[in-house]
A protein has these predicted regions:
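Carboxylate-rich, polar loop motifs that coordinate divalent cations or form catalytic acidic clusters
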Residues: 1-169
Length: 169
């Protein structure tokens, strides 16, 4: 898989000579509800269930649902602001120990449960930090904290301690 600024490129690694490589390109097609929702790729992520997610700069998150990647008609399930994602301008993703996916956008962090397809969104105001997330690849440290790159350095979070308030004024 190769993410570009103009779609997804796939090819088989089963070849003897480079000239034998057949490339497939998938791009956004507004007439096809199963195509990509954006063409400018920021990150490609495979979770522990081997699901592949494509993060686009203006089209949110696209999960590959096709069985084969060697096609110009790969099908995707998309997650955008309409489905509850904090922002369609997503930058990076990482999975925590509970199998939730954490998605960084420029000024928000979204927790996504792939089983229920539910989102919890945390703005940088909630995090009490004046910062913007970067496209740096997140990681997990030895204490199981998620580490995200920001324009101010990095941010460590403990996923189990991230809770939305139930308070209703």
């Amino acid at each position: 898989l190769v993410g570009t600024t103009f779609g997804l490129v796939t090819f088989s690694n089963d070849f003897a000579q480079p000239e034998e490589i057949k490339f497939y390109r998938n791009i956004q097609n507004r007439n096809n509800p199963f195509s990509l929702t954006g063409n400018d790729f920021m990150h490609i992520y495979k979770n522990s269930h081997k699901d592949i997610y494509i993060l686009t700069f203006t089209g949110g998150v696209n999960k590959i649902t096709s069985r084969t990647l060697l096609s110009e008609n790969i099908e995707f399930q998309y997650y955008t602001e309409q489905e509850g994602l904090g922002s369609d301008m997503v930058l990076s993703m990482i999975e925590d120990s509970q199998k939730n996916l954490w998605i960084a956008s420029e000024n928000a962090l979204s927790k996504f449960n792939p089983e229920t397809e539910a989102f919890e969104n945390y703005s940088t105001g909630f995090l009490r930090q004046k910062m913007n997330f970067s496209e740096a690849i997140p990681t997990i440290n030895a204490r199981q904290q998620l580490i995200f790159g920001t324009d101010m350095g990095f941010l460590e979070i403990v996923p189990e301690q991230m809770k939305k308030s139930d308070y209703v004024p």
